[in-house]
A protein has these predicted regions:
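Helix-loop junctions on the cytosolic side of multi-pass membrane transporters
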Residues: 182-207, 414-426
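Juxtamembrane intracellular "pre-TM" segments in multi-pass secondary transporters
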Residues: 1-17, 196-246
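Substrate-agnostic recognition of the 12-TM MFS/MFS-like secondary transporter fold
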Residues: 19-36, 61-74, 80-89, 112-168, ...
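Helix-loop boundary and gating motifs at the non-cytosolic
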Residues: 2-63, 239-283
Length: 426
């Protein structure tokens, strides 16, 4: 049964699509080995830092993920996927080297959050934009996005599990060596990546074709800069589907921003487990997310829409309530799996909708605009998360955040039906 579920993405993807899946899997696994344990875990367990320090780490990281995504989107639109990928690899290796070299003092860890955030934001187009450089067929795009999501979620299993063992055997900072190892493996996997150009109109430059690059490879700077951020912002907010999607993701993720700075304290003070469990419970979420991505792969085309996305986001909220609702690690494990299943459906749905709606020559920057809404929604709650935790308690604050995450998509489904129907007809 399980083998039949996984057979479709393996048999239907092109060689270049499989290579793209491997690139994303390896570079994302490196990130997953290091962020939660290497940054938040070091602050909470090794440095015994406060909620304010972890909130600052998440704030810095989210802000620089936003900045990195804008830089990455601009680089992709100007130079194409192959050069963008090489820059992503260089940035990841430089980040790991810097964090290892400068020690584990709180200030250094916060700087590490900045570097890691920028690097992750810069590399995000690998998952969100590269598929559109391989095909413009909606069904094939859904298959590629589901496969990317599925193996990205395998990263959430593999990365934190390996990171947990390394942290238990050595230290929480040692996980950055793993990040660098997986980055080198990603470079090897991506060495032969060649985007397709046959479905892109208006890019007949011979040198660009030989390089296999798309969108803005002309030597004329004014040509490569034609898809400005202002144009991409206008594209998002003048298209009913993209505008609604931006608002849905922003509002639905608003409550979720309280989780990152408080989760490590939930593990330490409520579940009463060690730092390695931060990796292992994250891996449980990855198991669920793989199953969710398989479900997304099996969705019929008529369900690839904003209503299905809202149902999946509401399920994220319900899973988060189960995750943080009790002091029992076994229940938290089940909650993480449920939460992962929901996220496994959300991500490929979101990416497919964007890729089939936005113009290819603006796709990198359009995804940066969409990512800004997502990440800014996570930044805003950081200002009050420490106060809420001090006033009501860590677990109570997380339960309240889970209720917000559940209620927002439910309200949008009930109150925004007319707008959703109009967007579906576009």
């Amino acid at each position: 049964m399980l083998a039949s579920l996984f057979s479709k993405p393996q048999s239907s993807l092109s060689v270049q699509a499989k290579r793209l899946v491997a690139m994303r899997f390896l570079i994302y696994t490196g990130f997953q080995t290091s962020y939660f344990i290497g940054v938040i875990g070091t602050l909470t367990y090794a440095d015994d830092a406060s909620v304010v320090a972890t909130s600052l780490a998440v704030l810095f990281m989210n802000v620089f993920v936003i900045l990195g995504s804008f830089a990455g989107g601009a680089a992709l639109d100007a130079w194409g996927p192959r050069r963008h990928f090489l820059l992503s690899i260089i940035g990841a290796l430089a980040t790991g080297t810097a964090i290892i070299a400068f020690g584990s003092a709180t200030g250094v860890v916060l700087l590490g959050a900045v570097l890691l955030g920028f690097k992750m934001g810069f590399a995000q187009p690998i998952a969100t934009s590269y598929p559109a450089y391989l095909t413009n067929d909606p069904v094939e795009l859904k298959d590629i996005n589901s496969a990317i999501a599925m193996f990205s979620n395998v990263s959430i299993i593999v990365g934190p599990t390996l990171g947990g063992f390394v942290a238990a055997a050595a230290s929480s900072r040692a996980v950055f060596m793993l990040m660098m190892l997986f980055t080198v493996l990603a470079l090897i996997a991506g060495w032969g990546f060649r985007p397709q150009t046959s479905h892109v109109a208006g890019h007949a430059d011979a040198d660009s074709a030989e390089e296999g690059e798309c969108a803005g490879q002309s030597s004329n700077p004014s040509t490569s800069a034609r898809a400005t951020f202002a144009t991409s912002i206008k594209t998002v907010f003048t298209n009913s589907v993209l505008a609604l999607l931006f608002c849905i993701i922003f509002l639905s993720n608003f409550g979720y921003g309280a989780f990152d700075p408080l989760e490590s304290f939930f593990y330490r003070d409520v579940l009463r487990v060690g730092v390695e469990w931060m990796g292992w419970l994250s891996s449980a979420s990855g198991v669920g997310a793989v199953l969710g991505a398989v479900l997304a792969l099996r969705l019929p085309p008529h369900l690839v829409n904003l209503k299905t996305l809202l149902v999946a986001l509401m399920s994220v909220g319900l899973g988060s309530l189960l995750y943080v609702g009790t002091p029992y690690v076994g229940v938290a494990l089940v909650g993480q799996i449920a939460l992962g299943i929901a996220w496994g459906v959300v991500n490929p749905l979101h990416n497919t909708i964007v890729q089939t709606t936005a113009p290819l020559e603006q796709l990198g920057r359009v995804n940066s605009v969409m990512g800004f809404g997502n990440m800014f929604a996570g930044v805003a709650p950081l200002a009050i998360a420490p106060w809420l935790a001090a006033t009501f308690g860590v677990q109570q604050t997380l339960v309240g955040a889970g209720m917000v995450v559940t209620a927002v998509p439910a309200a949008l489904l009930l109150l925004g039906r007319w707008h959703l129907d109009c967007a579906a007809k576009q």
